[in-house]
Every structure is written in structure tokens, then in C-alpha cells.
Amino acid sequence: MNLEDIRREYLLGGLNREDLLPNPIDQFNVWLEQAIASGVPDPTAMTLATVSKSGQPSQRIVLLKHLDQRGFVFFTNYRSHKAEDIAGNPCVSLHFPWHFMERQVKVQGEAVKISTAETLKYFLTRPRESQLAAWASEQSQRIDSRKALLSQFEAMKAKFTKGEIPLPDFWGGYVVKPQAIEFWQGGASRLHDRFLYCNENGSWQISRLAP
């Protein structure tokens, strides 16, 4: 297979310093709203990169579920591999690949657990089947078969037949508090536009980076 000639030009337009808002969270909100309006598939899907205690990096796609001035919130099983990595090294990276708009956003920061109250508020908005799945799946653990997973799911359905499904004590959210956010816009002739926001003593500084 020849991969060398697979390429395309980026022609949707550039990004100028004067186009950017002073706060990167506000700027991200603008781009996210534009991605949603443009029909970008799974616009809230983001790659979460973590590093284990031994220095082994791992990546997986998770969904952005809330955004505010603290940072980027996602939810997971606290016994998962990603949670183990975060417990040993809270420094993480997020990546939003909005190919359709010739844009990408990279976030570097620290992942911190959110409160149980905030987790519960979100958990109660999830479909009942998703709540049951949180109980049924021992995330990242080896299992014998899909049949075994479905059997555990049915067992949880039988256990929680009436009323609200309680929040598992091993499931919850993290907020990634950003220290740096990069906005990338594709440009012609590979002369892409890159702007980096860095948090310096509580103030956001913006720099243009070479592509």
C-alpha cells in the first residue's frame, strides 16, 4: 500500500490573532458551536491521553460532557486504566479532531475528580440502560465473552427493577483544568495557523506558533 501520496490541501480559510477571544475557554466554545452547526460528526468526542507510573502513554476517545471556566469534564469508571493512570500522574492531554472544518484543538492540563453531587446530577440524566451499563461493566478488566457481559447487564436490570438506579461509588467525573490550549486551523501549502494560549500566573498569554 502506497501512503505517500495521500494528502489534501486545506483551503477553508486562515486564523488571525485578531479573530481570537482573550479567554481560550470562550474561544473553544465558539469553535464547538461552529462544529455542531456545521454537522461535524461527534463534535464532543475527544482523545484523552494519559501516562502510567511506568511512563507508558495510552489514548482513548471519551466524550466531553460539560465545559465551564474550570475546564473540560468527562466521566468514567474510577477503576479503569485511565483512572489508574490519572491517580499516578494527573497530567493529561485532550485532542479534538474536527477534520471536516480543517481544525483541531489540543488541551494540556491536570485531571481532577469532580464532586459526587456533580457526578450524580449528570448520572441521573443518562438513559436507564447507560446507568445499568455503568454497574455491569468492570471497565478495562478481562472478561470471558460478550455473553458474560450481557449476562451481567441482565443481572443489573433484575437488581434495579424499580425506582432510580443509584450512582455506583466507582463511577464519576473528572475536570481537566487547562494550562495550555492550542487552536489549529489548516492552511494552504501546509502553512497552517497555530495559536497557543498558556496560563501564566492566572493570566492567559497568546502566542503564534510556526506550523
UniProtKB/Swiss-Prot annotation:
Record keyword rRNA-binding present: no
GO biological process, one term: pyridoxine biosynthetic process
Lineage: superkingdom: Bacteria
SUPFAM superfamilies the record matches: FMN-binding split barrel
Recorded GO MF terms: FMN binding; pyridoxamine phosphate oxidase activity
Cofactor, how bound (note): Binds 1 FMN per subunit.
Binding site for substrate: 7-10, 65, 122, 126, 130, 190-192
Keyword terms, alphabetized: Flavoprotein, FMN, Oxidoreductase, Pyridoxine biosynthesis
Catalytic activity: pyridoxamine 5'-phosphate + O2 + H2O = pyridoxal 5'-phosphate + H2O2 + NH4(+); pyridoxine 5'-phosphate + O2 = pyridoxal 5'-phosphate + H2O2
Protein residues bound to FMN: 60-65, 75-76, 82, 104, 139-140, 184, 194
Biological pathway: Cofactor metabolism; pyridoxal 5'-phosphate salvage; pyridoxal 5'-phosphate from pyridoxamine 5'-phosphate: step 1/1; Cofactor metabolism; pyridoxal 5'-phosphate salvage; pyridoxal 5'-phosphate from pyridoxine 5'-phosphate: step 1/1
Family membership: Belongs to the pyridoxamine 5'-phosphate oxidase family.
Protein name: Pyridoxine/pyridoxamine 5'-phosphate oxidase
UniProt organism field: Teredinibacter turnerae (strain ATCC 39867 / T7901)
